[in-house]
């Protein structure tokens, strides 16, 4: 009877280990960066696999795009600024 309980416990523990996805994340990206060999997901978490590395954009890329958009000059702004000048 004791042996059967031990076998059942071992089987349950083994199944629990098998259910853990090896590509599960290890935490949040810090300033858009992750430990070596890991990718930053579009939601800001580090991990391996297509859920994290599948898309080309990373948090760093997104931040660079936002910064570039904020600093880009709108061509219509220049026309409006010079509209009242001779």
Swiss-Prot record:
User: Record's InterPro entries?
Assistant: Antimicrobial_C6_CS (IPR013006), Chitin-bd_1 (IPR001002), Chitin-binding_1_CS (IPR018371), Endochitinase-like_sf (IPR036861)
* Cleaved propeptide residues: 56-86
Other comment: Its chitin-binding activity is strongly inhibited by divalent cations.
Question: SMART domains of this UniProt entry?
Answer: ChtBD1
* Span of the signal peptide: 1-25
Please state every residue range assigned to the domain named Chitin-binding type-1: 29-53
Q: How does it assemble?
A: Homodimer.
Question: Which Pfam families does the entry mention?
Answer: Chitin_bind_1 (PF00187)
Q: Which organism is it from?
A: Amaranthus caudatus
Q: Which UniProt keywords apply?
A: Antibiotic, Antimicrobial, Chitin-binding, Disulfide bond, Fungicide, Plant defense, Signal
Q: What does this protein do?
A: Chitin-binding protein with a defensive function against numerous chitin containing fungal pathogens. It is also a potent inhibitor of Gram-positive bacteria.
Q: Which GO terms describe its biological process?
A: defense response to bacterium; defense response to fungus; killing of cells of another organism
Superkingdom, taxonomy of origin: Eukaryota
Alphabetically, the GO molecular function entries are:
chitin binding
Q: What is this protein called?
A: Antimicrobial peptide 2
Q: Which cysteines are joined by disulfide bonds?
A: 29-40, 34-46, 39-53
- Supply the Gene3D superfamilies for this chain: Endochitinase-like (3.30.60.10)
